[in-house]
Regions:
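Terminal, non-catalytic protein-protein interaction segments that mediate quaternary/complex assembly
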Residues: 1-178
């Protein structure tokens, strides 16, 4: 996706921008308390109990220092990588996003990511927006974001709503499947 494609998506469609920005900030602070997300108006982690165990905050808390390193070094001969997840680790929500790679090419940022699993209606748009927000913290113009998807699915409880959205209906809201 080009930066203009992303801008069109995020400005032309309804997504929970503020909540997703707040969520990313909490992830990057390493906040594991579900109550803190609730205080920010984010209720989609409630099903995990009171604490997020080996989930996004566990790994995203490494992101600020990685971003600082990228901004300081800006080495085109090096790919900077954030890995999310750990094989066999106990978790109440394994991160769907598994790897984010930052590459500097011709004085611009190329971001590549791998997502192991993705709810097409809720998780995928949220993760794309998070990636976009992350790129804005790097002091380089964005050249592209490439997202490789291992599994994309639509949950049964959202099939009718997906059809309505694809038919052009506006304001369709999707339900979590937990």
């Amino acid at each position: 996706m080009s930066p203009l494609d992303l801008l069109d998506i995020f400005e032309g469609h309804t997504i929970a921008r503020r909540k997703l920005r707040d969520e990313l900030q909490l992830f990057m602070k390493g906040e594991r308390s579900v109550e803190k997300y609730r205080e920010a108006g984010i209720s989609w982690w409630d099903y995990c109990g009171s604490i997020l165990i080996n989930s996004y905050p566990t790994y995203f808390e490494r992101l600020p220092s990685l971003i600082e390193k990228i901004n300081r070094e800006k080495r085109c001969s090096k790919n900077y990588v954030l890995f999310l997840g750990e094989t066999g680790a106990e978790s109440n929500q394994v991160p769907c996003l598994s790897l984010v790679q930052f590459q500097i090419e011709d004085d611009g940022l190329v971001l590549s990511a791998y997502q192991r699993s993705s709810d097409a209606n809720l998780g995928l748009p949220a993760d794309i927006y998070h990636l976009y927000l992350i790129t804005r913290q790097i002091d380089l113009p964005l050249k592209s974001i490439t997202l490789n998807l291992g599994n994309v699915h639509i949950y049964e409880n959202n099939i009718d709503k997906t059809c309505r959205l694809l038919a052009g209906e506006e304001g369709v809201r999707f339900d979590l499947n937990v």
